[in-house]
Amino acid sequence: MLTSGLLLVAAVAFLSVLVLMSVWKQRKLSGKLPPGPTPLPFIGNFLQLNTEQMYNSLMKISQRYGPVFTIYLGPRRIVVLCGQEAVKEALVDQAEEFSGRGEQATFDWLFKGYGVVFSSGERAKQLRRFSIATLRDFGVGKRGIEERIQEEAGFLIDSFRKTNGAFIDPTFYLSRTVSNVISSIVFGDRFDYEDKEFLSLLRMMLGSFQFTATSMGQLYEMFSSVMKHLPGPQQQAFKELQGLEDFITKKVEHNQRTLDPNSPRDFIDSFLIRMLEEKKNPNTEFYMKNLVLTTLNLFFAGTETVSTTLRYGFLLLMKHPDIEAKVHEEIDRVIGRNRQPKYEDRMKMPYTEAVIHEIQRFADMIPMGLARRVTKDTKFRDFLLPKGTEVFPMLGSVLKDPKFFSNPKDFNPKHFLDDKGQFKKNDAFVPFSIGKRYCFGEGLARMELFLFLTNIMQNFHFKSTQAPQDIDVSPRLVGFATIPPTYTMSFLSR
């Protein structure tokens, strides 16, 4: 008994010393880091966080520690930036220092620092420069891609008409349509809406995207080193990501076999040609792994964010039929019913532009932003961030900054209208992030949102299964991504 008691005392003493050493070490490391709650060994600040409401948990901590604070997601040390001023200071005023890519554990299982989105340094710069130029070559920002979007909008409207006013879940109607625009650029062709492989790909994208917003997805962000070896829903997300990579690899292999270096058909061909041009360059970033994963980056990002934003937008417009009616009125007055909307019409449609911006602000697709990493020891305000420190630029806190939006929790297009009813820009409108690593698909996404929404609303009224006052527009999940509620609706011809 005495021996057991001594062993217990020794074990408790040993653990106490470990905790004290950990706290001392963290304080030493964090001597010039922003303040924050004291972490525990391995679990960090897990006990102070609600993984079902990670964004809200972090914002609650900011109320105590200020707009710049330090948090430990398990063993991961993160500096969190809240509000327009702090985020702009970092991502714009000190853009180079904050240009590294931080961890996104679920996607990092596959990407591991490759591809244009999840890479850093020279790799990220080269892939980004190439991707922007190639997208432009294939019509992004030009009349060519506008015609492609209008063509796809026509297919979508036909699909909605075939429902004959029945109540449907619009999720895959929208993702098929939006995905076909980016597919025509990266693969050189669109998919048939009933293509089983296409629908399987869309389910894989939706599934892995939604996992990042779940409680388990946020838990995986903290403890990925252990959880990646354990059973659980993360394994399904990995399976979906692997399925997407396998599909892209198959597409690339087909393009390799049929490549004409003098006549690129799509993004994949352009990358393959660049690989041939640089095959003798030992420092090239143009090789198969970056091709497959950059293509997957474009395919994934070009599908999920815009389609989910539209899905949230439909719900918001059913909640606010007065706003829907004003958009209908502006469409009828500026465009009429006899021609398709054009992107240039937005210049004469301030109310519709304001509504689209407010949908994006309210939907807040990536509330914690894509994690950044400082590329060197960085002085930020009164703090010193050691090289490699991860940073969360809380885009949601900018989109809801009360200094810039009078009623940030309310859906109100007046946030983007001046006293004369004209559209006004807002420095806190950052759904595509800001600085050197802003989303370079922003121009395409803006065009898609305007053309798809106006084409649909030119042809249909929206009808919910519920009265407007009973519609709940609170997000279903909020983690890495914001996921709107699941609902059904009817498209009634106008």
From Swiss-Prot:
It is a peripheral membrane protein. Its EC number is 1.14.14.1. Keywords: Acetylation, Endoplasmic reticulum, Heme, Iron, Membrane, Metal-binding, Microsome, Monooxygenase, Oxidoreductase, Phosphoprotein. It is found in: Endoplasmic reticulum membrane; Microsome membrane. The modification N6-acetyllysine is found at residue 379. GO terms for cellular component: endoplasmic reticulum membrane. Its cofactor is heme. One of its GO terms (molecular function) is iron ion binding. It holds the Pfam family p450. Liver, with a strong circadian rhythmicity. Circadian expression is regulated by DBP. The modification Phosphoserine is found at residue 131. It is an enzyme of class 1 (oxidoreductase). It catalyses: an organic molecule + reduced [NADPH--hemoprotein reductase] + O2 = an alcohol + oxidized [NADPH--hemoprotein reductase] + H2O + H(+). Heme binds at residue 439. GO terms for biological process: cellular response to cadmium ion; heme metabolic process; response to stilbenoid. There are only 11 differences between the sequence of testosterone 15-alpha-hydroxylase and that of coumarin 7-hydroxylase. By site-directed mutagenesis it has been shown that modification of position 209 is sufficient to convert the specificity of the two forms of the enzyme. Exhibits a high coumarin 7-hydroxylase activity. Belongs to the cytochrome P450 family. This is Cytochrome P450 2A5. The lineage of its organism: Eukaryota, Metazoa, Chordata, Craniata, Vertebrata. The gene is Cyp2a5.
